Amino acid sequence: MILLNRRRIMINPQDRSRAFNFALKMQDIFATFVGLSILWSIYALIFTQIEFIFISKVLLTVICIGFGTLTPLIDFNESHATNPLWTGHARFHLVWQVNAMILTSVLSIALLWFFYSVTNHLIVIFLNYLWIFSFYATVFGLKFFDGELNDINGVPPVLIKVFGRDYEIDRNIQAITGSLFVNSYAVALFFV
């Protein structure tokens, strides 16, 4: 588990813009939506005749919605794209990456729902894993380019309690790990 230190200066909501606070609130709401989607899928598997492929498509769509909406909400504010501590070139690459993620999400949803085929289903699975595994490759390579999961004025961590002990977990780790599990669940449903 990757834990964060406690040197964040934008923990207090009043230190952040309304847009940034809105993005963080939407991320929390979306996490609940993902949880409800998983519960729905379990219900659908046990109590309905809904095809596994359809459930897989819904779960992949949920991931795409997260990649295509939450990423720009979180990244297009003072924590990333307009972060005064970042160089203009770093911001350029961030916006480029986020735009690519948005376009990938739109393409994936179109492939799943408007141009469906088994091949397109597999392409969407692959595209989701591409974003997920490229994130983990970057996390594991942080020491090679002196990178960090978060900046001092970046996104605050998620606070969780495990066996009575408090932990701070980076929101990217939380979101991408959740995406990994949901995407893998969708893959299992696809191949059943």
Specify the residue positions occupied by each region the protein language model found.
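Juxtamembrane boundary at the C-terminal end of a transmembrane helix
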Residues: 187-192
